[in-house]
Amino acid sequence: MKPVEQIKLPIQNEMELFEEKFKDSMLSKVPLLNRITYYIVRRKGKQMRPMFVFLVAKMVSDGGFDERTYRGASVVELIHTATLVHDDVVDDSNRRRGFFSINALWKNKIAVLVGDYLLSKGLLLSIDNEDFDLLKLISIAVREMSEGELLQIEKARKLDITEEIYFEIIRQKTATLIAACCGIGAASVGANQETVQQMRKFGEYIGIAFQIKDDLFDYSDEKIGKPTGIDIKEQKMTLPLIHTLNTCSEKEKKWLINSVKKHNTNKKRVKEVITFVKENGGIEYTTKKMNDYKNKALAILENYPSSAYKDSLLQMIDYVVERKI
């Protein structure tokens, strides 16, 4: 059994019902929209974000559940899907999860409007049911995701990202949505504010570890879904590179920056950069940082009694840092 399927076992029934509710939440009177959303549902991913909502809700309430939890999971998945559709337009990407992206099939104009539609459906699902606490959590995430993306674009132009700014970017771009999932899971079953914020922090730590793992893939010798060196080719300043720039000599620093700025499409130079980062401790340092965040997430779970839901969250943490793709 695949790790994600193993993690899903305690909430298998909830996830199956969620899929039906999620489909219903996207329905429209416009036939074109229904064709597109049907296409989106058919090419679903691992659905890790709804899994976080359900597992946290069950863990903090001793297996309890609420209709609000389904709505919270649907809101999260609607917002997440909207951001993916918009991301593909921004990145001019023609593929998503092995399928053609929405913009590849229906062009950018329709893709942007579909993303807007999904975003509005998510917000209205909360408003119509007066789930204002859940709406606030997801709205904070949407704001931070936009800020993180723009901060990265601003800093990428000069390649002057410090480690502090790097962590702020990945916290906003990646971790904030997982934090919202965990916070929404707790809030949906009536957990107190302290627990909601603790679960948000738990999700944030996992999200940061998740993104750091993604950064490490760029330097991996193993064959994975993501091509080696793609971040360097796209001039993305990731933690292994940032740490190496902070610890090497001025001469080496100039060579590194010049390589990323002007020779990022030269395969030989990209390989040289990867080798230099590896030889100068960039991978070891980054792996240590990833494990630091993993341990912070584990420390939060220690506050909760043993349960199948807690076990799945522990497995989720391991999966995030040990996954091959």
Model-derived segments and spans:
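All-alpha prenyltransferase/terpene-synthase fold signal
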Residues: 1-325
